[in-house]
Curated annotation (Swiss-Prot):
The lineage of its organism: Eukaryota, Metazoa, Ecdysozoa, Arthropoda, Hexapoda. Expressed by the venom gland. The keyword Membrane does not apply. It comes from Chelonus sp. nr. curvimaculatus. The keyword Signal applies. It is found in: Secreted. This is 33kDa venom protein. Residues 112-123, 217-228 have a biased composition (Polar residues). One of its GO terms (cellular component) is extracellular region. It comes from the Eukaryota.
Amino acid sequence: MAGKEVIFIMALFIAVESSPIFSFDDLVCPSVTSLRVNVEKNECSTKKDCGRNLCCENQNKINVCVGGIMPLPKPNLDVNNIGGAVSESVKQKRETAESLSGSFDKEKASAENLSGSFDQQKSSVDEKSGSVGQQKGAVEGQSGSGEQRRETAESQSGSVDQEKASAENLSGSIDKQKVTVEEKSEPAQGQSGSVKQKRKTTENVSGSLDQEKASAESLSGSFDQQKSSVDEKSGSVGNDDDISVQ
């Protein structure tokens, strides 16, 4: 009888263990999903693929073994050195961040230096532009002065031309008077000497007017030379307008 009881108890235990309705695993798996810990990410298809106290659950579209206990440490993993490894990793990340920050500082300084260089170049270009503007103003001023000198010379030349014409008219009038005197002059005993004196006087006056006429022509030629010189200077100033300052 004792042997049959033992066999019956073992059969009952196996039947209960393999029953799909009741399982000892259901007693140890927590009902709150957030408390379940992924153990080694072992894939499974049923609870039997996992160890005791574990359940097969779908996480991120993958069936893995989970349970209410902390995961076992990996083989050959020194738990005491986990803190040191984390500290070393943090230290390396900190050094990398500091190196990256230093690199950014250097790039920032280089950019500031480049910006300062551009500012200096811009200031130099502005100064050159101002110098070109001053030179252009000076050339325009010289051109205006040349125009004024040319107009003054032309006015003086016109005045000399008027004086020359006036002298020529006066000379023609004296020539007419000379001819009239010569026509009226007749050899007479009492009037012959007087006529000769008047004739000499008229010739002297005519000669004086001829000298004044020659002087006026010389003065006109001098003003013509001055006008030509002013025209040449004005043309030189006009050529300066075409000068382009690099």
